[in-house]
Structure formats: C-alpha cells, structure tokens
Amino acid sequence: MAQFAQVMAEVGDFGRFQVRLTILMGIPNFLSAFFVFSQVFMVLDEAHYCSVSWVKNHTFNLSAAEQLAVSIPNDTAGRPESCLMFRPPPDNASLEDILSHRFNETQACDSGWDYPENRPPSLKNEFDLVCERENLKRTSQSVFMAGLLVGALVFGPVCDWIGRRPSLLMQLLLSGIASMATAFVSSFELYMTLRFALATANAGFLLSSNVLLSEWVGTSRRTRAMVLAQSNFALGLMALAGLAYGVRNWRLLQIIGTTPIFLLVFYFWVLPESPRWLLSQGRTEEAKQLVQKAALVNGRPLASELLNQLVPEKTGPSGNALDLFRHPQLRKVTLILIAVWFVDSLLYYGLGFQVGDFGLDIYLTQVIFGVVEVPARLSSIPMMEKLGRKWSQLCTLTLAGVMCVIIIFIPGDLPTVATALAVVGKFASSAAFTISYVYTAELLPTIIRQTGMGLVSIFSRVGGIITPLVMLLEQYHKAIPMLIFGSLPIGAGLLCALLPETRGQTLKDTLQDLEQGQPPRSYKTAPQRKDVEASGRTSSARVAVVRSSYF
C-alpha cells in the first residue's frame, strides 16, 4: 500500500497545479489587508468644535470666525478648544457683553460638533468619534482583533469537520456580507458588531486557505509557497493606500474595497478539496480523482497501480496542551514562544495602526509599509538559512524594538527621520513574524506541534487585541505606546538566546526526543544513521508545517 506522501512525491512538490493554488490562496490574503487596516483611513484627524446652537440661533449677524470666538475658548497654544465651549449667556445678554467674554465659564459640548464644510463623510464626523467618544476608535480595533481570535477558535474545528473547500467558500461569503453591511450602518455600535463578524470570518478564510495550501504543496516547497501566499497581504496594503487616497467617503470606500470578494464566486468551480482531508474521512475515490487531476496538470500522470494503492497516512500518538508545560525543556521553549508571538502581534499591529502618526503623509507611509513587507518576508528564508532560526528571530525582534525606542527621541519637526525608523521597524517586525512560524514548527515535537502552534497563536491574537488599548495610553504621555512597542520586542528577542537552534537539525517527533536531544528515528548501522540525519537536515531547513496564517 502507498502512503499519501509517497503518491504526492510522484505528483510533484510544487508543479503547475500547486502554483495555481498558491495564486488562488494569495487572493484572500490580499483582500485581508483592506479588512484589517481600512478603518485607519476612515478616522483621520480633522478639525472639530462644539456645535453651539445659541450662537447660530441669535441674530447677531456675526461671521463664522466671530461666532467661533464668542462661543469657543482657546487652549494654551491659542487654538480653539475642540471639546469645550462657553456656557450660553442669559437670553437678555447684549452683544457687547458677549464679545467682551463677560460670560467665560466653560463646559463640555452638549449639542454635538461642527466639522469643516465640504469635508468627505468619515467614521469620525458621522458618528462623532471625538472628545469623550474618541476612545471608541481604538476600542473598535480591539473588537476586530477579538473577532480574529474567535474566528480562529471557531473555524479551526469547522474546517476539520466539513472540509477545507466548503469552509473556505462559506467564510468568503460571510466576509463579503458582513463587510458590505458595514457600509450601511446607522450607529457606531452596529459598525463594531459587524466588524467583529467580519473579523471572525476573515480569520476563518485565512486559516482554511493556508491549511489547504499546506496539504497540497510538498514538504520541500511548503514554506516558500506559504510565504509567497502571505506576501499578497503586503500587496494589499499598497492597494489600500491608493484606494483610500482616491476614495475619501468612508461608505463608498467600504463598498469598493469589499466588492472584489464577491468576484471570487468562481472559486466554487475551481477550488479543490484537500485530498489528505478526503482520505481522513474515508472518501478515497474522491481523493484519487483529485490527485490524478493534479498529476495531469503537472505533466506527471500517475500509474493506476500506484494510485489504487493509496491509503491514508498513519497518525502517531498525539499530545495535549498540558504536555507543553509538563516537561522542563518544553515548558521553557513554550513560555518563550508565547512571549515571542505575543510581541510579534503587538509590534506588527502597533506600527500598522500608527501609520499616520510619524509625520509624513499617511498614504505615502502606507505604501512604503506595504513595499517593505514583500522583501521582509522573502528575505526571512535566506536569513534563516544563513544565520539560523534563533539568531534570525533574536535580531529581527531586537532591531524592530530598538527602532521604536529611538523614534521616541526624534523631534516632531523631523518626520522623515521618524518615518524611516518606522519603516525599518516594519521590515524587521514582518520578518520576525514570518520567522516565528518556521521556528516554532521546528522547535515543537510532531505529536504536539499543531497543539503548540494553536496555543501560541492564541497569545498572538491577544497581543493584537491589546495593541489598540496600549495606544490609548498616549493620552497620558505620547511616548508610552512606542516605549511599550519597543521595549517588549527587545526583551522577547533576548529571550530567544535561551532557545535551541534548529537549522540543519532533525525534526523531533516525541517529547523524549526533544528533552534528550536525540535523533527521532532509529537506525541499525552507521551508514543508515548518516543517511537519516542527512535527510533530516535537508528537509528541516525548508519545512515548517504551518497550518494557519496570522497575517
């Protein structure tokens, strides 16, 4: 009988069929950039002042500037306050008394806010996300990140239950519906609810697409294929900048950014199911048909004798989450990986959500952020091969953290310098995130690899949820968020020095292999041992069995 891996080796690790699938799976990653970061361009800073009805209703015949002067106090810099107004004077007050600021007691805005005329509709001016409601901007981003966590927890089992293909199709449809409905909301609370639903579905299709890709691509090309698919997220960041620059109406931007997902209806006819999943469900004939189709597309038709021998791969014993903490060596590795993944997310989204805070044009900065992500992710592969996994992870996290700390000391009149440092930090954080997937998969034993990946992914999502809340600390001091975004990655990076190197090492299969540091496969003679270890070094340098994508 032939194992699935043997048959797929004859089909080809990365032929024309897998290339097509990589392109198909890259599209959801491309669209995901809009869903994650589009709100940044819908809440841009704009002037706002208390709407003062008594001035508007009076027949003083004052100009707009005079109305502002008699109704709004100035701050310490001499600019009109955004969240305070003078108390309305008595009805019998004369114009002279009002102009002399005789009635100069202030209060919070009680009738809404006025915004510049002819301004495009935005989330900020439609739902008054200013003053005491300004924190809702960050809260809604945390709600979205919480949806990503829930989606990963919910759709992981769904993907295993109904299959990769139907799960992916369902999640794409739900994403489109939730995102399109967001453009027609009448309250910000409803907006946040739909964003949560969108994030849940978004996490689902990212998970399903990467699972499907990992189960079709051979081990020698799996890491590269998944990095290529994830690089489409960076292309989506660049496209988002151009789209947001041209479309300033937030509702229209939401509609245009969502529409492409409905064009993926052709996935219903071209998207294949995972043959590995079909075999696990006992649907052997369907799996054989798919494998033969892939072989024909790759120009490597299979012999019917080999195909008829296809049987599911045998699964070994599995572990649980508690096993990650029972063994001293694995406990140390797990705790450090939790810190690394938490910081990966905190840093990546911290820089992404602050794209407009570095002084340069927000649209230009967004394009630059997208541009640097592509080489950052692609360069992580040769970096890991040259420096090793441990030092690549340590250096990228530390570099990103140092950049964030330096930004704190850059004067506000040097936006180019601050942006340049942020770009270097963005490059390093993107590379660090990609390295984490490979390094984590190689550090954890086979029997508990998926469980461990799931656990650290949860903490990564928690980091994403906390990121917008950390940014709220800027109301106490502007440097606090960037100090946190800088110091934590440096600490996590230095912790990586305590981890073992996995470059050129045989992947561990059991908990005993990890603790004893012994090769996981048995051998009878010295030549067989060399062959096995050489094979392990060859494969482990390229293989990271990653079943989900955070980006």
Swiss-Prot record:
Topology in membrane: Multi-pass membrane protein
Gene Ontology cellular component terms for the protein in this record: apical plasma membrane; endoplasmic reticulum; Golgi apparatus; plasma membrane
Catalytic activity: nicotinate(in) + a carboxylate(out) = nicotinate(out) + a carboxylate(in)
Post-translational modification: Glycosylated.
Keywords assigned: Cell membrane, Membrane, Transmembrane, Transmembrane helix
A Pfam family per the record: Sugar_tr
Region of interest called Disordered, as start-end residue ranges on this chain: 515-537
Entry's localization field: Apical cell membrane
GO MF, one annotated term: urate transmembrane transporter activity
GO biological process, one term: urate transport
Keyword Cell division: no
TM regions (residue ranges): 23-43, 143-163, 168-188, 196-216, 227-247, 252-272, 333-353, 355-375, 394-412, 417-439, 453-473, 479-499
Function description: Anion antiporter that mediates the transport of nicotinate. Possibly involved in nicotinate intestinal reabsorption.
Similarity annotation: Belongs to the major facilitator (TC 2.A.1) superfamily. Organic cation transporter (TC 2.A.1.19) family.
Name of the molecule in the record: Solute carrier family 22 member 13
Lineage, highest ranks first: Eukaryota, Metazoa, Chordata, Craniata, Vertebrata
